[in-house]
Amino acid sequence: MRKLVVSVVLVASSLTGSLFAQAVNGGKSLYERLGGQPAIVAVANGLVDRILADNRVNKWFTHAASSPENTNAYKATLAAFICKSVGGPCQYNGKDMVAAHKGRGVTSEAFNAVAEDLSKQLDQLKVPEKEKREVMELVGSLKPSIVQTAATSK
């Protein structure tokens, strides 16, 4: 019961924070401020291209790199995840971050390298600093769900 209450409080807090952020930004979601779906697709596509070329992390993405079809599918899934995460209308049907990364041995260094790739992609697309910071904070909040420690990899 306690876990349920904590979960409800966390969900309510995130929704309240999201609504507060929209009010502060003239009612526009981060999705809208980033430029909508075309911008989200550009972020996802560019990020996947960067990840697949990044020798620090590409070993975790061999399936995505195994064929053009798999690369495109991964880009589409990532775009849906980003879209949903920044308040867009997309439906994300993929796994949650814990399930998607369980047993993969993702290190803090690998997470940071992907975050660096994302930051460079946002810079290339000339995303304003405020929105870039919000995206990077969202990504940072995912780190505990993605990075594997001895306790989480079991």
Regions found by a protein language model. Name each.
Residues 1-8, 16-17:
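Bacterial N-terminal signal peptides that target proteins for export
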Residues 8-9, 149:
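A periodicity- and composition-biased signal for non-globular, repetitive helical segments
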Residues 13-21:
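C-terminal segment of classical bacterial N-terminal signal peptides
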Residues 20-154:
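Core of compact, soluble alpha-helical bundle domains
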